[in-house]
């Protein structure tokens, strides 16, 4: 469905304000920092109020204050009936935002279910490493790192 110009302008103004980008509204996106670009990408994705948002690393390069704002916006979107699909390597982010989780590595699905089902009593970080067969190398051979 097509949105009328007044609705688009109202939503854009609200998103720019919420994301702290109002003063940069006339700046070319190519001149934005990585974090600002990430925020503008979210604003572009959400302005039409889609049923589903698919976000890749939504908090990467974003400062903590903006990150909290983005989390709040995403929670509000979900509370309003929307669905958010997040791809992230930051398990703490996944644990704080997601109800359901799929662990995918090298194109293979290793686990899917609610957060608790996938974690199986562990942190999601530990469970992810367990599921994908993480490297147990702790750098013990790097003896030159010691200052003794």
Which role does the model predict for each range below?
Residues 53-57:
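Catalytic Walker B motif of ABC-type/P-loop ATPase nucleotide-binding domains
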Residues 68-80:
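Helical segment within the ABC ATPase nucleotide-binding domain
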Residues 6-24:
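Conserved ABC ATPase "signature" region
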Residues 94-96:
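A short, surface-exposed alpha-helical micro-motif characterized by mixed small hydrophobic
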Residues 112-113:
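ABC ATPase "signature
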Residues 49:
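Conserved catalytic motifs of ABC-family nucleotide-binding domains
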């Amino acid at each position: 469905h097509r949105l009328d110009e007044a609705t688009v302008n109202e939503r854009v103004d609200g998103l720019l304000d919420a994301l702290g980008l109002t003063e940069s509204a006339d700046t070319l996106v190519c001149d934005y920092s990585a974090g600002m670009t990430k925020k503008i990408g979210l604003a572009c994705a959400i302005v039409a109020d889609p049923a589903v948002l698919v976000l890749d690393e939504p908090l990467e390069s974003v400062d903590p204050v903006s990150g909290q704002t983005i989390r709040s916006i995403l929670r509000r979107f979900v509370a309003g009936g929307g669905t958010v699909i997040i791809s992230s390597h930051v398990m703490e982010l996944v644990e704080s935002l997601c109800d359901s989780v799929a662990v995918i590595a090298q194109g293979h699905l290793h686990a899917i279910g609610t957060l608790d089902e996938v974690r199986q009593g562990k942190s999601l970080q530990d469970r992810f490493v367990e599921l994908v067969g993480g490297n147990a190398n702790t750098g013990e051979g790097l003896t030159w790192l010691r200052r003794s």
